[in-house]
From Swiss-Prot:
Keywords: Cell membrane, Glycoprotein, Membrane, Sugar transport, Transmembrane, Transmembrane helix, Transport. NCBIfam families: SP. It comes from Gallus gallus. It is found in: Cell membrane. The keyword Transport applies. GO terms for molecular function: D-glucose transmembrane transporter activity; dehydroascorbic acid transmembrane transporter activity; fructose transmembrane transporter activity; galactose transmembrane transporter activity. This is Solute carrier family 2, facilitated glucose transporter member 2. D-glucose and maltose competitively inhibit fructose transport. D-glucose, D-fructose and maltose inhibit deoxyglucose transport.
Amino acid sequence: MDGKSKMQAEKHLTGTLVLSVFTAVLGFFQYGYSLGVINAPQKVIEAHYGRMLGAIPMVRHATNTSRDNATITVTIPGTEAWGSSEGTLAPSAGFEDPTVSPHILTMYWSLSVSMFAVGGMVSSFTVGWIGDRLGRVKAMLVVNVLSIAGNLLMGLAKMGPSHILIIAGRAITGLYCGLSSGLVPMYVSEVSPTALRGALGTLHQLAIVTGILISQVLGLDFLLGNDELWPLLLGLSGVAALLQFFLLLLCPESPRYLYIKLGKVEEAKKSLKRLRGNCDPMKEIAEMEKEKQEAASEKRVSIGQLFSSSKYRQAVIVALMVQISQQFSGINAIFYYSTNIFQRAGVGQPVYATIGVGVVNTVFTVISVFLVEKAGRRSLFLAGLMGMLISAVAMTVGLVLLSQFAWMSYVSMVAIFLFVIFFEVGPGPIPWFIVAELFSQGPRPAAIAVAGFCNWACNFIVGMCFQYIADLCGPYVFVVFAVLLLVFFLFAYLKVPETKGKSFEEIAAAFRRKKLPAKSMTELEDLRGGEEA
């Protein structure tokens, strides 16, 4: 078989591989849906909370366009920003019956949003343990119970104390998503052939933005975002959980887990044959054997060892920084201002403009699926950060000069769309799967757990702190993010390796400065960051 034929064989998609990846990323679809769904029915849920708690809210809208009845906005902890305007909340002020403080209602709403991120933070540390203990497929099966339970509580919210049921349901769903955000990249990276690992890994982000977009559309008033149907809207993600549960029964276990962790050679070969079809599995078996030998020498790696061992230090720093750059890039801030900017630009229904941003979000995530294996992870990550930096500067100029030149609102609108586009090109999808690529089998579960916790924690911090930064800096708030983006760009240029087309062993070896055969070293020339570290 010549080189071209081998490459085509390595890029061959079988039905089992497609089913396995689709089933796994349903976990990220639920993640995206849960991020976006709480935003659309905000007004009706707040009103319901008010009735439940004995307060009668006056007519006051969460996204008020009138200057005489302006809305003061606060940031909701746990805000996420893939196409969602979640994060702006009208204080529940002005109640005819003051039996309940408006601050209490604000607190309950804040908890309804933020407990999702808290749940994710708590569970993310157990990803490595449950993934190794149960196996990748069985672990995803078991944690689906959390999603089903959480969505059931929210779907039945009107039948009990709604605020308690929603807060509990969001927390339990967050527990599921924290586990899923680690297990899914782990499984997808391990079942994907090297030539397709980047493209298939990008599907995580596509599932997230699709979930957000669908939740935004279904949350429109004339669909499910009304006083009668909002519990159904909140609990609808449980359908995806049920679908994933039954489809997982048809998916093969990760051959890498079977071979390296359990030593089940024949079962690993059977799993590979199901995933690869008629392709000869011996090349991948040989790669696994090398990785198994490395894993045997390093044994099981705990989170403490991950940080204390100089062997993993560079890879850990890179893994954490790509997660931090995703959350601290300013994407949340962009969507914090987007509704107001759309209004000032003359858009009559800002919610539809936000959905339009969600559509752009989804389209460019699809494009990134095809770009990631052609341009490489490192190149796209750098391009995305630089594009976001330029867009942040343009956004600052637009906001500062908006009061002097009305047409600057259009500059701001263009900057929003460009910011989102560049985010989806690199910093959006790449952190989710590059962490799994940076580590060999031994430290991979611990590394994914730490990176997942970092992502969730940064998500929560941004939600908690952004309002104070915005109040302090005003329209110059994006200067802060521009500086951060510059720091992230310089770090990525110096330290983030190219993982395109590399085996796990080759990537790990680059961080260890291990000398590989001449051919492998030629393939690793782009790993400048790992070699210079």
